[in-house]
Amino acid sequence: MNEIISNHTLDALGLRCPEPVMMVRKQIRHMQDGEVLLIIADDPATTRDIPSFCQFMDHTLLNSETESLPFKYWVKKGL
């Protein structure tokens, strides 16, 4: 797979639910449609919460790496 270029990075390491998703929501509000946010997290709940957030808020989860820590998610603002 080609490398995904991110416009922004969010470090959520050490944070626990619901903080990572709250931070993602705040960051995405300040982004333009089509920009990509790289989220780095280690909370196991993010494997469920980030995809659900994207679906509920109409953002695109471009890719995720959740086989080992830290977890990484690439989220594009909008569909």
From Swiss-Prot:
GO terms for cellular component: cytoplasm. One of its GO terms (biological process) is tRNA wobble position uridine thiolation. SUPFAM superfamilies: SirA-like. Pfam families: TusA. It is found in: Cytoplasm. InterPro entries: Sulphur_carrier_TusA, TusA-like, TusA-like_sf. GO terms for molecular function: sulfur carrier activity. Keywords: Cytoplasm. Belongs to the sulfur carrier protein TusA family. Sulfur carrier protein which probably makes part of a sulfur-relay system. PANTHER family: SULFUR CARRIER PROTEIN TUSA, SULFUR CARRIER PROTEIN YEDF-RELATED. This is Sulfur carrier protein TusA. It comes from Mannheimia succiniciproducens (strain KCTC 0769BP / MBEL55E).
